[in-house]
Amino acid sequence: MALLLLGVWGILLLLGLWGLLQGCTRSPSLAPRWPPGPRPLPFLGNLHLLGVTQQDRALMELSERYGPMFTIHLGSQKTVVLSGYEVVREALVGTGHELADRPPIPIFQHIQRGGGIFFSSGARWRAGRQFTVRTLQSLGVQQPSMVGKVLQELACLKGQLDSYGGQPLPLALLGWAPCNITFTLLFGQRFDYQDPVFVSLLSLIDQVMVLLGSPGIQLFNTFPRLGAFLRLHRPVLSKIEEVRTILRTLLETRRPPLPTGGPAQSYVEALLQQGQEDDPEDMFGEANVLACTLDMVMAGTETTAATLQWAVFLMVKHPHVQGRVQEELDRVLGPGQLPQPEHQRALPYTSAVLHEVQRYITLLPHVPRCTAADIQLGGYLLPKGTPVIPLLTSVLLDKTQWETPSQFNPNHFLDAKGRFMKRGAFLPFSAGRRVCVGKSLARTELFLLFAGLLQRYRLLPPPGLSPADLDLRPAPAFTMRPPAQTLCVVPRS
């Protein structure tokens, strides 16, 4: 191991010298003026200023010195960081297609090869996104039929929770319901919680998300050649291939034998129907159908499941907030009436708590964009192909927008009379052309599941721990998921 580390450092030294020589001979940047930023080191750039975890906080600290728009070097790659509500919103909403692309992130280039929805760009991304938005609308994500499926899943989750008899259970179990709702939408059926396919998919998704957030993948994305030499990407690619194997089987069993004109009953069925139509640019060929399904499985499960887990965990951490939510639910719904989407107006405190959860946890701190053309932004001219990081954490914790940004405070979303109020700086789903395609469904299912759980259960820390003992530091993963924890779920009398 010592010899291997010496060899790696030798490679880094040689590459650093090469980078220094290249910097002396490289032609000037196309942009007449970059935002200010810290001076980079040869080869490493500014990586020494960023931690391995919670890099968004390190970037926010740099913004205090260099301003809301600054340049950092991730290795040799110049990258522009946007920090704070005003500049992030201007970039995401005010620029149109010029900032709608993704930069070529090495690990996702290996996984998706430019396909799918979330890390693709250009015509393929536009076609995939338009199709997905249209299909979700046609499947009725806001209609009573989908509400019924969410409430059915809530009933199944309650049955699973009841089986523990008030004994400690893993927080991760609460993510099963949101995952199954996504699978119902994608595949047209829910899975039993003991179904081997369901169990395998959840386990693989969990492993992939942990690997994607690992230091090894961060190193691979910054120095892909070195990372490939060290085979840092192999573990995650191996797990992704296991997911693909399951998805291929699910796709094959849902492939219509002949072109049909009837409405699709699931996202996958709609994808397969689209692939049977005239598709001269192969937008919906077999490879991209699999890539789109993989994207929806990974992103559509992790984010909503982690948010529900955080919401429950924060109620255990803040029992006084939990009590106020339950008082409101008892007053408006009583013990027997299940929550419905239209109840949100009558439940302002419950709605405020859910919004505050999403603000406070900053689940996806930043997903980079890339300039599709030379662009004027914040007084600077950024050339085509510049990676740009809109730092969503800085928006959700912006001191100019939130009264107590570092505290969990549902009053951020309540006016002086206790009525729910929207906040412009509430951007957990991002904004503009890349806003989350599943935003509407996520909001509906989070409200129904959260309200349904608190209506029925008291959420308590495990024996031997008090709420003050609970550690809120996120677990290392691609998203800022909650730590592995147990809790007790006890029926309310």
Swiss-Prot record:
Cofactor or coenzyme needed: heme
Chain positions carrying an annotated carbohydrate: N180
PROSITE patterns: CYTOCHROME_P450 (PS00086)
Subcellular location: Endoplasmic reticulum lumen; Cell membrane; Microsome membrane
Gene Ontology molecular functions: all-trans retinal binding; all-trans-retinol binding; heme binding; iron ion binding; retinoic acid 4-hydroxylase activity; retinoic acid binding
Enzyme class, UniProt record, top EC level: oxidoreductase
Annotated heme binding sites: C436
Keyword Oxidoreductase applies: yes
Record's keyword annotation contains Glycoprotein: yes
GO biological process terms held by the UniProt record: aflatoxin metabolic process; phospholipid metabolic process; retinoic acid catabolic process; xenobiotic metabolic process
Pfam families on file: p450
The entry's keywords: Cell membrane, Endoplasmic reticulum, Glycoprotein, Heme, Iron, Lipid metabolism, Membrane, Metal-binding, Microsome, Monooxygenase, Oxidoreductase, Signal
Signal sequence annotation: 1-23
Cysteine pairs bridged by disulfides in the record: none
Catalytic activity annotation: all-trans-retinoate + reduced [NADPH--hemoprotein reductase] + O2 = all-trans-4-hydroxyretinoate + oxidized [NADPH--hemoprotein reductase] + H2O + H(+); 1-(9Z-octadecenoyl)-sn-glycero-3-phosphocholine + reduced [NADPH--hemoprotein reductase] + O2 = 1-[8-hydroxy-(9Z)-octadecenoyl]-sn-glycero-3-phosphocholine + oxidized [NADPH--hemoprotein reductase] + H2O + H(+); 1-(9Z-octadecenoyl)-sn-glycero-3-phosphocholine + reduced [NADPH--hemoprotein reductase] + O2 = 1-[11-hydroxy-(9Z)-octadecenoyl]-sn-glycero-3-phosphocholine + oxidized [NADPH--hemoprotein reductase] + H2O + H(+); 1-(9Z-octadecenoyl)-sn-glycero-3-phosphocholine + reduced [NADPH--hemoprotein reductase] + O2 = 1-[(9S,10R)-epoxy-octadecanoyl]-sn-glycero-3-phosphocholine + oxidized [NADPH--hemoprotein reductase] + H2O + H(+)
Main location as per UniProt: endoplasmic reticulum
EC number(s) given by UniProt: 1.14.14.-
Coiled coil: none
Tissue expression summary: Detected in colon, ileum, and testes.
Family indicated by similarity: Belongs to the cytochrome P450 family.
Function comment: A cytochrome P450 monooxygenase that may play a role in retinoid and phospholipid metabolism. Catalyzes the hydroxylation of saturated carbon hydrogen bonds. Hydroxylates all trans-retinoic acid (atRA) to 4-hydroxyretinoate and may regulate atRA clearance. Other retinoids such as all-trans retinol and all-trans retinal are potential endogenous substrates. Catalyzes both epoxidation of double bonds and hydroxylation of carbon hydrogen bonds of the fatty acyl chain of 1-acylphospholipids/2-lysophospholipids.
Protein name: Cytochrome P450 2W1
